[in-house]
């Protein structure tokens, strides 16, 4: 019993396989998807998506987008995505520290918005490799 998942970024297909369960970072909170889920279209936030295949969970960082589930087909269109296996934990930690400094030093609205997005991305990347 599984659902088919397609994760599509502007530059590539990130994931195209079946899974038993998915947890998405929707704009209203975490959203669990199982076989037989009701049709749904939802906005995605920056965060970590978790995909369960057999008994193994695979974390994938999503950089916002949309997800649609219908007839056990989950299609996810994202601005960007990165599998945890591609992330260096030490670099992710350094990136988080650097983005925290930039966030604290931001003075204009534009700088604050950009720093907030970069900080959220850095947190998600570190969370994905720390799970």
Swiss-Prot record:
Q: Which GO terms describe its cellular component?
A: chloroplast thylakoid membrane; proton-transporting ATP synthase complex
Keywords recorded for this protein, A-Z: ATP synthesis, CF(1), Chloroplast, Hydrogen ion transport, Ion transport, Membrane, Plastid, Thylakoid, Transport
Q: Establish whether keyword DNA repair is in the entry.
A: no
State the protein's name. ATP synthase epsilon chain, chloroplastic
- Please report the record's description of how this protein sits within the membrane: Peripheral membrane protein
- How is the quaternary structure described? F-type ATPases have 2 components, CF(1) - the catalytic core - and CF(0) - the membrane proton channel. CF(1) has five subunits: alpha(3), beta(3), gamma(1), delta(1), epsilon(1). CF(0) has three main subunits: a, b and c.
Intracellular or extracellular location(s)? Plastid, Chloroplast thylakoid membrane
One Pfam family linked to the record = ATP-synt_DE_N
Recorded GO MF terms: ATP binding; proton-transporting ATP synthase activity, rotational mechanism
What domain of life does the native source organism fall in?
Eukaryota
- Sum up the protein's function in the record's words: Produces ATP from ADP in the presence of a proton gradient across the membrane.
From which source organism is this entry? Guillardia theta (Cryptophyte)
The similarity comment for this entry is: Belongs to the ATPase epsilon chain family.
